[in-house]
């Protein structure tokens, strides 16, 4: 199947399904989900149906999207939902007029696979969708969920450049699940409240490139307990792949994270100030080391990326993690860029 295959201002339920029945007037937007029939796409689409900043929800997939649209279209919120198939210019229709485009399309991980193992299949899918999006809705904000994000976001950039419409502020790699896992897993170790723990996660979105900055979240752990927590955050997806025994990867938690990132982007587009997420964007932070993309805290605005925040003060342990991450990131980014070059 084509489908499977985003801190401080975040209140989980309200952020994803804010005031679904509110009579308060506010600007709403068209959101397109590419890969809406898959394991992530279906629950992601449902969560977006609950968001009062979505006026129109366009669902596309090579199969199943009209059925998903018919199903979630019964949910009693005001947004209109339409599902599109590839025939009769379905992709173009889904993208036409979209303010935000979310891409969870691609194949899922199976036991023993890393995110990077998905490159061979997912790279071409993301490239082709980027071409279509760039030609149809060049001013949209693009949220790439498809793994390996460290490579697919550079692919998306290169494709947009080919079309002549790339705007760095408009392109996001969705790494929100790393932040979600960091707060949840840390709360299990510290007995704190997950929703009150804000752990910045920088770097990338694959294994050792995921660098949780526990020190910035006020978490003081050392030794084996710290190492185990860091490893679990970095490789938490493996738990789900193993538990599902070949039947899929982290689809539901990823849908939640994707909906959170989309909600943050929509809130910023609507004019809300101070909206922040950790996200993988074209960044100046490590360009002097040849690394054009990096995940860090980003303040969102009406034009997408507003402010890219530096990593900030970190301890020696985190510095060592970051050094490893940068080396891996450079290789993954280059791999993606060369795919379209």
From Swiss-Prot:
The keyword Transmembrane does not apply. It is found in: Mitochondrion matrix. NAD(+) binds at residues 35-41, 61, 122, 254. It catalyses: (S)-malate + NAD(+) = oxaloacetate + NADH + H(+). Transmembrane segments: none annotated. One of its GO terms (molecular function) is L-malate dehydrogenase (NAD+) activity. The active site is at residue 205. Homodimer. This is Malate dehydrogenase, mitochondrial. It comes from Schizosaccharomyces pombe (strain 972 / ATCC 24843) (Fission yeast).
């Amino acid at each position: 199947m084509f489908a499977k295959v985003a801190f401080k201002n975040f209140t989980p339920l309200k952020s994803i399904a804010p005031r679904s029945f509110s009579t308060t007037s506010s600007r709403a937007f068209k959101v397109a989900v590419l890969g809406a029939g898959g394991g992530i796409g279906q629950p992601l689409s449902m969560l977006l149906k609950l968001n009062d900043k979505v006026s129109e929800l366009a669902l596309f997939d090579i199969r199943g999207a009209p059925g998903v649209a018919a199903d979630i279209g019964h949910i009693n919120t005001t947004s209109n939902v339409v599902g599109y198939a590839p025939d009769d210019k379905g992709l173009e229709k889904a993208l036409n007029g979209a303010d935000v485009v979310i891409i969870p399309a691609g194949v899922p991980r199976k036991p023993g696979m890393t995110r990077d193992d998905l490159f061979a299949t997912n790279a071409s899918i993301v490239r082709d969708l980027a071409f279509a999006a760039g030609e149809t809705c060049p001013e949209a904000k693009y949220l790439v969920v498809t793994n390996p994000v460290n490579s697919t976001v550079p692919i998306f950039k290169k494709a947009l450049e080919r079309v002549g419409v790339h705007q760095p502020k408009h392109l996001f790699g969705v790494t929100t699940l790393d932040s979600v896992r960091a707060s949840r897993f840390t709360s299990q170790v510290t007995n704190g409240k997950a929703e009150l723990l804000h752990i910045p996660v920088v770097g990338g979105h694959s294994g050792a490139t995921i660098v949780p900055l526990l020190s910035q979240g006020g978490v003081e752990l050392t030794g084996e307990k710290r190492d185990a927590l860091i490893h679990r955050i970095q490789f938490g997806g493996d738990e789900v792949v193993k538990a599902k025994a070949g039947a899929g990867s982290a689809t539901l938690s990823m849908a939640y994270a994707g909906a959170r990132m989309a909600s943050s982007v929509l809130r910023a587009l609507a004019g809300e100030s101070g909206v922040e997420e950790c996200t993988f964007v074209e960044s100046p932070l490590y360009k002097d080391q040849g690394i054009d993309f990096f995940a860090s805290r980003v303040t969102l605005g009406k034009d997408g990326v507003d402010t890219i925040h530096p990593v900030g003060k970190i301890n020696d342990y985190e510095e060592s993690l970051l050094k490893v991450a940068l080396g891996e990131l450079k290789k993954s980014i280059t791999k993606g860029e060369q795919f379209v070059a």
